[in-house]
Amino acid sequence: MKVILKKDVKKLGKKGDVVSVSDGYARNYLIPRGLAEEATRGNITQLKEKEKIKEKKHQQKIEEARDMASKLEKEKFVIKVKSGENGRLFGSVTTKDIAETVKKAGYKIDKRKIDLDDNIKALGTYRVPVKIFEDVVATLKIQVVEA
């Protein structure tokens, strides 16, 4: 019997897979526990429709991320901090500070997506990569100036 998996099942497949199993396994275990449904023409058509919608939403998110990345790369973000002699900062500029500055400019970025190797500890201009969505990366221009 062919079934469509509703959830991931160990040693059988992932959600959405169409697999062949014995009739007893399907009727007595998979279907009653809500792990699968019988693979009828209607159910398979419905599954394909859901996959198309999911792919369309995914493409839309990628497009939005690319649009946001291009907007972010055009802007220059200024962070004002106190500094001592020779342009050394009191403290440092962290991913949290960068995320807050970007948020003030009207963009929402998670601080964990900012790829800062080491905290910024001196005045100057820096290029900081940010992972927007999957493989969409924007490079922010951060200028650290004295307050």
Swiss-Prot record:
GO molecular function, one term: structural constituent of ribosome
PROSITE patterns in alphabetical order: RIBOSOMAL_L9 (PS00651)
GO biological process: translation
Entries under Pfam families matching the protein: Ribosomal_L9_C, Ribosomal_L9_N
GO cellular component, one term: ribonucleoprotein complex
Function description: Binds to the 23S rRNA.
NCBIfam families in the cross-refs: L9
Family membership: Belongs to the bacterial ribosomal protein bL9 family.
Highest taxon, organism lineage: Bacteria
Keywords of this entry: Ribonucleoprotein, Ribosomal protein, RNA-binding, rRNA-binding
Disulfide bridges in this chain: none
Listed name of the protein: Large ribosomal subunit protein bL9
Database matches in InterPro entries: Ribosomal_bL9 (IPR000244), Ribosomal_bL9/RNase_H1_N (IPR009027), Ribosomal_bL9_bac/chp (IPR020594), Ribosomal_bL9_C (IPR020069), Ribosomal_bL9_C_sf (IPR036791), Ribosomal_bL9_N (IPR020070), Ribosomal_bL9_N_sf (IPR036935)
Species of provenance: Halothermothrix orenii (strain H 168 / OCM 544 / DSM 9562)
Gene3D superfamilies referenced in this protein's UniProt entry, alphabetically: Ribosomal protein L9, C-terminal domain, Ribosomal protein L9, N-terminal domain
